[in-house]
């Protein structure tokens, strides 16, 4: 399974991160331990939503969509 996930900083609620992984628990641990350079400044993080995909390509396409302008609007209106 491939997971597209959205996390939100507990200390900086305006900071949202979208990612894709096959091991959600390990990835959340990485974000909260500071081993992920892009997110270490805003830790700790909480998992807001995740979606499971069987197809890796579809997961990465959806992740890219959520990072686009219209995808951010969709995310903010429907997922957060």
Q: Residue spans of the language-model regions?
A:
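GIY-YIG nuclease catalytic motif and its immediate N-terminal context
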Residues: 1-37, 43, 47-67, 72, ...
């Amino acid at each position: 399974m491939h997971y597209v996930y959205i996390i939100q900083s507990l200390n900086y609620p305006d900071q949202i991160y979208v990612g894709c992984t096959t091991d959600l628990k390990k990835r959340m641990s990485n974000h909260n331990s500071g081993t992920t350079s892009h997110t270490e400044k805003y830790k700790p993080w909480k998992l807001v939503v995740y979606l499971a995909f069987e197809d890796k390509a579809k997961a990465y396409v959806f992740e890219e969509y959520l990072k686009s302008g219209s995808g951010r609007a969709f995310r903010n209106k429907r997922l957060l």
